[in-house]
């Protein structure tokens, strides 16, 4: 039997693997041939997935004896390779969920996805258009696994889009293109967008091809897109056109899965803005990070099974180490499983073998009796945390809450020395968090974090003197970051002064036993500075457009010239100029000004630029996002204008400014000249 006979049994890695493991180099270092390892991995995974029970139970099955091996297996040494693969198989694949009960996802989220699948797939109307679902959430929270398990249980086919790999451009192909003796041959190329459109058309029109082991007794199917073509991130309008067309001609549901990112790249807002979601009726289901309690149960189950099977070959972590792993993975269960396997697979010299027949509970008692000193124990926990290796991130809502609520730990006289009596008013308990670390984990620039802090700090104070002191710290922090020449150097110092100053100024929260009148929830809001700064930039553009004859900067034009023009009785025929002067040059006669409308800050906000709320100029030096990218801004130009050159410059007016409504009849009116009568006549 030749090796080619085994090749049709090898399926795609995308289908068999739950996730690309981080331990592929284990198999590369082995002496097993490629065809042997591949065929074994596919056969074992397919048998465990389809015909066997759950993963945790199937891992207890013993291997076959040597006498039952075929001649082909003995030739290629499959006995040793099976033992090697069973010992070094990535745990993220070995313990992947197979049923709903094994999912580390909240039951309400599973029911929400299942309800959508039943309504859009199982109860779908014949002439119903294409429905679209957007699933978001942090990496490793079970988005794709939940969808595939529910689809498998309900008998729904999943046709998944995978970005095609372009063929390599060989040197001979390059020579053949420019060979004068032969005909000109272009290198065959097709854009990913064209391939993606063709895939959607074929997937919604034809059924899935029946592969080895597939069950196609049902015609219910969904299209899954998790890895979008890269061109859509540059030109999102092309994706929007594809979505609009699919809603009209689609025959099966289309599901997109996008992972959240706290590093500043908000792909959901770029690819699926609010307008497109409302226009195409896109449903949105957001997953939360895996809860520490659920993750702890999942890791304990893996540790128990591995300890019973390979107790002498792995290092069994204790409860403290597992809790440290759960804290360091930030709700990513894949990262936690990989870290658990990596931390347990240490060298033979560091292994602590157990005696035969010793249970895991007795081994834990033995480890407690032989526990080392505290500094060594702390170093071991730090080693496990370093193995986890994932940066801990905070949403903006939680980061602001840690600063504004400023929880503290009570100290005794033995813990730290007290301040002298003349400095007793500055005495505070130790903070539970480091403000600099909180800002760093929020993945936000320091000056932007100060804006959110300035907007919300007043509601957390009880004394006016404390508010005055906190405002002084914020003012000093703004001075440090005000100069653009030194902003990059002093930004971290400015944020440190602002955060620590606000926390220190709040005397009502200066001690652990008094938390500012209780720890009741207070809503947070986005800074009003965004709306005010947007209005200021629009007024500058309008002033330059309406008064081009005055060669003055926008600031001087609005503070020195326009207020005086509002007091003069110079007639003007341009209604836009009149409205603008009345808006800028005259203040309303109000004793009490109402607060601007505030936009609430949700618990999943990233604090990044939001074009719908006027945040696009927050960090671009007063320019909009389009101007910073070099894109021209569009303006509303009325078609009925026929003004002189001195007044016909409103083509750059923003849409929020009043536009002139003069018609052709108004332009033919005579100019009214008012005579000045002196007191002596």
UniProtKB/Swiss-Prot annotation:
Impact after mutating residue 143 to G: Impairs phosphorylation. Impairs interaction with DNA and the RAD1-RAD9-HUS1 complex; does not affect interaction with RFC3
Modification Phosphoserine, positions: 71, 86, 359, 646, 656
Primary role: Essential for sustained cell growth, maintenance of chromosomal stability, and ATR-dependent checkpoint activation upon DNA damage. Has a weak ATPase activity required for binding to chromatin. Participates in the recruitment of the 9-1-1 (RAD1-RAD9-HUS1) complex and RHNO1 onto chromatin, and in CHEK1 activation. Involved in homologous recombination by mediating recruitment of the MRN complex to DNA damage sites. May also serve as a sensor of DNA replication progression.
GO molecular function: ATP binding; chromatin binding; chromatin-protein adaptor activity; DNA clamp loader activity
UniProt key word Chloroplast: no
Positions occupied by motif RAD1-binding motif: 17-25
Protein location: Nucleus; Chromosome
Listed InterPro entries: Checkpoint_prot_Rad17_Rad24 (IPR004582), P-loop_NTPase (IPR027417), Rad17/Rad24_fun/met (IPR018324)
Gene3D superfamilies found in the cross-reference section: P-loop containing nucleotide triphosphate hydrolases
Main location class: nucleus
The keyword DNA damage is annotated on this UniProt entry: yes
Compositionally biased tracts (Polar residues): 631-662
Name the UniProt record assigns to this protein: Cell cycle checkpoint protein RAD17
Any Pfam family hit: Rad17
Gene Ontology terms: cellular component: nucleolus; nucleoplasm; nucleus; Rad17 RFC-like complex; site of double-strand break
Family under the similarity heading: Belongs to the rad17/RAD24 family.
Residues given in the record as ATP binding sites: 137-144
Record's comment on post-translational modification: Phosphorylation on Ser-646 and Ser-656 is cell cycle-regulated, enhanced by genotoxic stress, and required for activation of checkpoint signaling. Phosphorylation is mediated by ATR upon UV or replication arrest, whereas it may be mediated both by ATR and ATM upon ionizing radiation. Phosphorylation on both sites is required for interaction with RAD1 but dispensable for interaction with RFC3 or RFC4. Phosphorylation at Thr-633 by ATM in response to DNA damage promotes interaction with NBN and recruitment of the MRN complex to DNA damage sites.
Subunit structure as annotated in this protein's UniProt entry: Part of a DNA-binding complex containing RFC2, RFC3, RFC4 and RFC5. Interacts with RAD1 and RAD9 within the 9-1-1 (RAD1-RAD9-HUS1) complex. Interacts with RAD9B, POLE, SNU13 and MCM7. DNA damage promotes interaction with ATR or ATM and disrupts interaction with the 9-1-1 (RAD1-RAD9-HUS1) complex. Interacts (when phosphorylated) with NBN; promoting recruitment of the MRN complex to DNA damage sites.
Outcome of swapping residue 656 to D: Abolishes interaction with RAD1
